[in-house]
Amino acid sequence: MESLKNNDERIENFLNELKNLQSNIDKDIKEFSNSPNTSNAEKDGKFLSKHDEELYNKQIIRLTQEDRISNLSSLINSNIEDSFLLAYQTILNNLPGVGPVFQMIFGIMGNGIDLEKFYKEIIAQVEKMIKKSLEDYFKNQCNIIFNNLGKACDQHKELTQKWYDNHGIRSMNHLGEEIPQSSSTIESDETLTPMIHASYLDLKMKFNDALTYFTDSKYRGHVAPLLTYTSVMYFAFLRDILKYGKEMKFDNSIIDGTANTPGIKKISNDFVNKSLSEFLKSGVEYTKVVNSLQEGEWQTYPPPIGRVWVPPVPIEWVSPPATSLALKFFLANTDNYPKGGKVVKVTNGYYELSPIKMTYALEVYYSSGHGYSVNYYPSYRFGGKPILPLIAPVVNTLFTMLNPNRFSRTFKIRITHKIVREAKWNLDFFDNEVGEAGSFNQKFVFTSTTSHINPICDKSETAGVTEIPGPFTTDKKYIRLTCIRKFNLQEPKNEGYAYGSSIFSVELIDL
């Protein structure tokens, strides 16, 4: 009994710490939920710093909660003695809702209780509860931010569409189809351009919100698709201003920048490079979300080198608000883009929107000449169709298309590319990951080339478009395209998909 009495104060301290921790979390979340809306703030020099300070404070509070959890763990581990029964009963009485968990622990351990192990089990369960609460809060914040971003995108789209209508500019939707002229009342440029300028500032602020949350290293794997959509939308709006900014009366300092403030040209490059660097850091994390995006569609899944690719465990909450938003942002005239997709290049990054009936609707590619092997990166779905984030085939390249429900499909293939040498390819269909007993095989080479103008830097580049008409029909689960080449970069006479080449798109087009 003396031992139990000695532990009374320590047990009480432990319970008080738990209560305080949960109380502080509830208080912080409530404060964030009621934080002031900065979207209508004055657009002066103080606006961004105040907004950034709020975002910084939100990050600090999450870190503070994690510190409290860590401190609580240390407290428990340093106050272990032999008074299990009193500790157990006190917890049941003072921590409603957690009791069943501890009852289960008690049932598993039986009468021979190891108090140290018991306390560690307690704190592990409490940590799980608190971390889940924080993750749920973070998830909700992401969805709120993305919904706010969607409203801003809608407003920007409506304003710019009116401007395009006034100036007779043909704008395109996400399927590469022309958007009919708006039936709304025509407004003068004097009215529209200030509204477009304000809309851009609002978008910039909301995209910064999204980046702050979507690039959090602790949650990056969960929000990878949202990061993708956010990056592409933001870049699309920047692209519009680069293309039509002078006509929309944007000041040169906004487009070209000043000595102290970067312009949209630099922002575009920096933003794309940052976003793509997040992809490169997070390839492994991203595999955690792929399975939630693969139901019922043709997908591209490059297996890791040297082992069979296995679909990961599903993540439930990824992406719902993103799908509708992703259809809203391509507004600029696309006459200068190559056939087979609307490609915009910023330094070494490609963003491509493909026409209807493609295997995928959007792609992000990255190559700095040396390239990154496609085998390391998963795919994501965009608007009901998959995304292939990274392709730069310098080694032998394998594209594995997945037809999970084994629907019978008839299709042709179109490849948009820049080649250094011709490459022979194999196409085969099979029912398992390792590709045994392929049921079909065809060899083909790249042929035609066309020239197009890069709309960002006005540089003429050459792209080839090769079509393999087929038609190909299969109900197999996997479809594989393999590049056949000799891996000797020093020998120019060797055939193959060589150093310096790029693929802009590989399209399976339903017939």
UniProtKB/Swiss-Prot annotation:
Q: Which SUPFAM superfamilies match?
A: delta-Endotoxin (insectocide), N-terminal domain
Whether Cell inner membrane counts among this entry's keywords is no
Annotated gene:
prtA
Q: Which InterPro entries match?
A: Pest_crys_N_sf
> Is the keyword RNA-binding assigned to this protein?
no
Name the chain's protein: cAMP-regulated M3L protein
Q: What family is this protein classified in?
A: To D.discoideum protein M3R.
What domain of life does the native source organism fall in? Eukaryota
Q: What is an example of a GO molecular function annotated in this UniProt entry?
A: toxin activity
**Residues of the signal peptide:** none
Q: Which organism is it from?
A: Dictyostelium discoideum
